[in-house]
Amino acid sequence: MNKTRYRLDVAYDGANFCGWAPQPGLRTVGGLILDALRLICSEPPDIVVAARTDAGVHALQQVCHVDLISSPDPVWLLHRLRSLLKSETDLHILSAVKAPVNFHARFSAIGRRYVYRVIDKRSSWYPQNRYFVYRVNAFLQDYRMRRAASGLIGLKDFGAFCKPRRMGSTVRHLRQFEVIRQPDGQIHFFLESDAFCHSMVRNLVGSLIEVGRGALTLQDLFCYTKIAKRTPKIPTLPPHALTLIGIDYPQEHLFECQNRKTRQKRT
């Protein structure tokens, strides 16, 4: 039976979600979207997401795809989804468009972009930031963190920064790792990679925080990176200060090629 593929772009405040992945009895981003789709379509669709975010993580632009037999008009689908989800004020469907059959939200992606927000003792703390900013009770040295970040960029085995896994590669191409102190004193850590392992972003930023506070030397950090095994010396930061900025894709004629390349690298 022929199906039509749709790309959905989604934004959400992750504070009150138990992550993306649908789970019985839990409020998740993917679960709410699936519930809405079941009311729209006769068939129970599968949903594939570009970046499976953990509980508490936010997104400015998440991407997923679904295959539907009913082939609704995408404009109608967008309005219907928004109507069904209007009471969920921390979730918004940005767009819904038809996608080619070889578009894959996860495997067609060539980049994921994140920002992690931190504030240290150099700046005033405002209580309203507690849902989106991680507070560090120390004076962080920006230049040390920037040196550490620049040394982590490239194609490497990031096993030291990933949750242990039995199968699959931990080799990733980290293209961007910037440390930018904002005018209000917040420190924003911008990261971009072809893909990230589970907890990798929060562990990478955690390593820089340890370097910035003087608890971890650059030499030790790069040594852990070469060993490529998880160490308690690198903390996993909390999820509430992490935001998925967006997902990048190649031009349409390159979808199939990118799908094959990604599947080969991840298995």
From Swiss-Prot:
GO terms for molecular function: RNA binding; tRNA pseudouridine(38-40) synthase activity. It comes from the Bacteria. It catalyses: uridine(38/39/40) in tRNA = pseudouridine(38/39/40) in tRNA. Coiled coil: none annotated. Homodimer. Belongs to the tRNA pseudouridine synthase TruA family. This is tRNA pseudouridine synthase A. It comes from Tropheryma whipplei (strain Twist) (Whipple's bacillus). The gene is truA.
